[in-house]
Structure formats: C-alpha cells, structure tokens
Amino acid sequence: MVRTDAFFTENNINLVKKNPLHFDVNLFSSKSNAKDNDIKTFKDVLINSITDVNKSQLNVSKVTEQAILKPSSIDVHDVVIAMSKANMNLSILKAVVERGVKAYQDIINIR
C-alpha cells in the first residue's frame, strides 16, 4: 500500500511523497526539479497553485487581446478553452481555500 506521510514541525505540516504517481506537487508547477522524497509544505503547494492560477488568468487576457487585435491569428475555440481552463483553475483553488478555512475554523472551535 502506497502512503503519503505527514509530519509536523512547529507551524508547518510537511508531506513526504512516497510514490511518484501519487500526490504530484509538480502537477501545477512549471518547475520539475523535485525529487521523489522532497519535502513540500502545504504553504508552498498552495502558493505555487495560486501562482499558476494567476498565470492562467493572465493567459486569458493575452489570448483575448490577441483575438481582438488580430482575429485571424487565433481561433475562437482557443479563447474559449483558455477561459474555461482559467475558470476551472480558479473554481478549484477557491474550493480548496474555502475547505482550508472551514477546517481551520473547525479546529479552532474544538473544545
């Protein structure tokens, strides 16, 4: 059975990747220099995800501007696909942040 182990240090939860097929932290990151047992904090993964969502939003702006200024240089479906990807990325990130906030509130309310 393959597991992803976690251990706690001060205020950080560190995750250890046990299998390269599971919990790929480079899924949203353009940097592929991670090794199999690299330790990434939740904060690092979240910040990388936010950065990638921002890049997808900026890509939509660029593609839309290109479609307006040079309509023959880009297909309409490429614009729609870029918008859909950015919307999906933002929706997923929003859901993760909301769940994280709810989990934090639940932990705080435990007495």
Swiss-Prot record:
Pfam assignment, any one? FliE
One cellular component (GO) term of this entry: bacterial-type flagellum basal body
UniProt GO molecular function:
cytoskeletal motor activity; structural molecule activity
Any one Gene Ontology BP term = bacterial-type flagellum-dependent cell motility
Q: What is its main location?
A: other
Does the keyword section mention Repeat? no
Q: What are the entry keywords?
A: Bacterial flagellum
Name the domain of life this protein comes from: Bacteria
* Keyword Oxidoreductase recorded: no
Q: State the compartments where it is located.
A: Bacterial flagellum basal body
Q: Which family does it belong to?
A: Belongs to the FliE family.
Q: What is this protein called?
A: Flagellar hook-basal body complex protein FliE
Lineage, uppermost ranks: Bacteria, Pseudomonadati, Spirochaetota, Spirochaetia, Spirochaetales
Q: Which gene encodes it?
A: fliE
